[in-house]
């Protein structure tokens, strides 16, 4: 019997192009096995129907994944107008039908109405938790759980293609936006129904789909080639300000102490900390009132010195 390759410590970020038909977790596990990585996590669930950008965080990168969850995102969505499905997408059953002879002008007006700061009720078929279980588990049993509306921002909706009943839109939005629900809202504004037939995440936190890699492409590379595709852990927090500390101050941070710091930095956001030779140490909080730095999330000493 062939022995499985031993798992190894891998640290970094893989920009994965998730294929259609796989859950985000299944895609994550396939990537983890390709890298023989000990630890892996992803940032932001994509439905099985959806494809596109799924950042995978290996090892120490997982410590900073939460900061990517808050990032803005962009999607390309394909709608079928005139039909509602039980799940809001093509995986569900058609449960209602209405007019599909929508004009481009009507569709443009509806898209404009759903742009900006809006409130959105998350769909039942989602990974949001209720009493420890994802909502989709209740939905599959026909149980409807009351959901509170969320404040979201839809920065733009651009119409890429329109030939009713088919419409393709490009959406830029804040975290927590459900494109299925947005598509239903666009249709409702017109007085009809809609569901998604395709969804692709094209951007998140400044990363683009052009930077991503498919599972098939990764499988055709050797270990060194795959490792060379990993981005460093600090790309997840590159939007925060940065500073450099000397070795003594870094040591204090790593020991749970608060080194003195007197530079002009914002105190209301995490700060990236680097050593004098450019090594990423982690995130700290600048406590301006006492001129001290407090550790928030730090790289493991062995990993950060590798």
From Swiss-Prot:
Molecular function GO terms recorded: RNA binding; tRNA pseudouridine(55) synthase activity
SUPFAM superfamilies named among the record's database cross-references: Pseudouridine synthase, PUA domain-like
Domain of life: Bacteria
Keyword Oxidoreductase: no
E.C. code: 5.4.99.25
HAMAP family for the chain: TruB_bact (MF_01080)
Database matches in PANTHER family: PSEUDOURIDYLATE SYNTHASE TRUB1, TRNA-PSEUDOURIDINE SYNTHASE
Name recorded for this polypeptide: tRNA pseudouridine synthase B
Organism of this sequence: Neisseria gonorrhoeae (strain NCCP11945)
Gene: truB
């Amino acid at each position: 019997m062939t022995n499985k390759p031993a798992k190894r410590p891998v640290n970094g970020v893989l920009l994965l192009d998730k294929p259609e038909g796989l859950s985000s977790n299944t895609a994550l596990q396939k990537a983890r096995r390709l890298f023989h990585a000990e630890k892996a996590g992803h940032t932001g669930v994509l439905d099985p129907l959806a494809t596109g950008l799924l950042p995978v965080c290996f090892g120490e990168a997982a410590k900073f994944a939460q900061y990517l969850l808050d990032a803005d995102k962009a999607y390309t969505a394909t709608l079928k107008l005139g039909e509602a499905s039980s799940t809001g997408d093509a995986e569900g059953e058609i449960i209602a039908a209405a007019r599909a002879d929508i004009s481009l002008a009507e569709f443009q007006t509806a898209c404009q109405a759903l742009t900006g700061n809006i409130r959105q009720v998350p769909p039942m078929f989602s990974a949001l938790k209720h009493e420890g279980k994802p909502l989709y588990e209740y939905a599959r049993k026909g149980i409807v759980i009351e959901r509170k509306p969320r404040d979201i921002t839809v920065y733009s909706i651009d119409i890429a293609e329109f030939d009713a009943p088919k419409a393709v839109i490009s959406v830029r939005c804040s975290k927590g936006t459900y494109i299925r629900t947005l598509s239903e809202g666009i249709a409702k504004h017109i007085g009809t129904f809609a569901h998604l037939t395709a969804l692709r995440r094209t951007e998140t936190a400044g990363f683009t789909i052009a930077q991503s890699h498919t599972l098939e492409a990764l499988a055709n590379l050797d270990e060194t080639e795959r490792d060379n595709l990993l981005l460093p852990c600090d790309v997840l927090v590159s939007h925060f300000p940065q500073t450099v500390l000397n070795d003594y101050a870094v040591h204090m941070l790593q020991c749970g102490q608060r080194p003195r710091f007197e530079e002009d930095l914002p105190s209301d956001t995490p700060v990236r900390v680097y050593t004098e030779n450019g090594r990423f140490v982690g995130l700290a909080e600048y406590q301006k009132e006492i001129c001290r730095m407090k550790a928030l999330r730090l790289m493991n000493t062995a990993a950060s010195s590798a």
